[in-house]
Curated annotation (Swiss-Prot):
This is Myozenin-2. Belongs to the myozenin family. Myozenins may serve as intracellular binding proteins involved in linking Z line proteins such as alpha-actinin, gamma-filamin, TCAP/telethonin, LDB3/ZASP and localizing calcineurin signaling to the sarcomere. Plays an important role in the modulation of calcineurin signaling. May play a role in myofibrillogenesis. The keyword Phosphoprotein applies.
Amino acid sequence: MLSHNTMVKQRKQQATAIMKEVHGNDVDGMDLGKKVSIPRDIMLEELSHLSNRGARLFKMRQRRSDKYTFENFQYQSRAQINHSIAMQNGKVDGSNLEGGSQQAPLTPPNTPDPRSPPNPDNIAPGYSGPLKEIPPEKFNTTAVPKYYQSPWEQAISNDPELLEALYPKLFKPEGKAELPDYRSFNRVATPFGGFEKASRMVKFKVPDFELLLLTDPRFMSFVNPLSGRRSFNRTPKGWISENIPIVITTEPTDDTTVPESEDL
């Protein structure tokens, strides 16, 4: 039985190998720390097992992305092999390439030279223009498509009632019938004095009213109706009841003049 530490080391090694396969050798140059690297390694390890649906979907998506990413990988590898063979043959024959000459980049076949002006024949061979040979009247004619008629429709085509039942139509509004002319015995309110007096125009006299001025006290009473109300607020009172005013005398208490007696 393997110990826990060895199992953890093996898992880390598997995760690092998977990371190298996916991202290349750039993983060693960046240390993201334990908080980022360990959960990422565990996640990639779980995705590599194909034991759950998420891992299978991840692999399917990875294959689909690789299909478009590495589409020209075989062509590039073949071009590199051909270029290396040509270089070896040139060295053997003594035809060395000049140092100042620049080689054009590898491009797929049937690709126009970007340095030359664009030619319509090179861009789209066989295209002579916007339908010059076909007259413009051909585009204005509208072709009526042939519709399909089922055997059921063919069988009932001779019977109009069945056709109407097959294709229901909206109901048309029926015409209104003329109402009979009945005599009305409803009672009508008769005006006082008969219809002859009621036909005269009734004159209405506007009653006279007096306009008050703004300085009129009656108008002021209307503006502030609380001004004439009786006040029931309690007023402060002294020690003497019934609101009798207190009269304070200012007579001096010490009399300087001494009255004379009868003996003197």
